[in-house]
Amino acid sequence: MTLTAIFRGEHLEPPPWLYARLAQGSLMRLIYRRLLADLAGSLPPGTRVLDVGAGPGYLLSYLARDRPDLSLWGLDLSHDMIRRARPRQRAMAPETAPRWLVADACRLPFPAGIFGRVVASFSFHIWPCPVAGLQELQRVLAPGGRAWVYELRREASLPDLKAFARDLGLPLPFVYLGSQVVRRHHALAASEFTSLIRQAAGARGTLQPAHHIFWRAELQPA
């Protein structure tokens, strides 16, 4: 499958109500816990964090609970997704609750250099502007900041799937069948992801496997 086909795959994404339901499920909660451990353990106190493509907002809600010292911002292009995220904000103390807004990853509504960490989890493959989007993540990074972009690895092997299932305490058949369903249209190959990173960030972007079956791209400030 070509890059053009991948980045025109929005019709393959679940509607917001179904995505929100899936995000509440046990599998996504386990995955969010892994990403949360990556984030929470790496951020200095008071870091300003932006979640791009935040969906219904579970990752930032979990992060707000574990790290109330952080300043959290979440955005999504879907009004419905942000509508679903905001009720969790009302249940938190105002000083710790994430701030939610509807916005486009291709044109982030922030000045340059203000976020210590930017994260995008499993939304990048449907961005219509992959290179410009990565450059926008770089643009808003503060000096010393990092952007992390998580996606599913198309090359994930059976041993990778076994390790992932073992770590999360899930049945291998469940993980295997699920991966086969989503990997064709929702996963990136190393060559594809690396090419986009090089176009956007040059030597200031790297790609490495994460949690057995995912990629994590890391971008430094431009």
Regions found by a protein language model. Name each.
Residues 48, 145-146:
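Short glycine-centered segments of the SAM/dcSAM-binding site in methyltransferase folds
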Residues 117-129:
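A short SAM/SAH-binding and catalytic strip from SAM-dependent methyltransferases
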Residues 1-43, 58-62:
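Conserved class I S-adenosyl-L-methionine
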Residues 131-143:
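A short glycine-rich, Lys/Arg-flanked "PGG" loop and its adjoining helix->strand segment in the class I
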Residues 106-117:
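A short acidic, Gly/Pro-enriched loop at the edge of an enzyme's catalytic core
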Residues 50, 56-107:
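Class I SAM-dependent methyltransferase SAM/SAH-binding core
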Residues 216-222:
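C-terminal lobe and adjacent flexible extensions of AdoMet/dcAdoMet transferase-like proteins
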Residues 150-215:
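C-terminal alpha-helical "lid/dimerization" subdomain adjacent to the S-adenosyl-L-methionine
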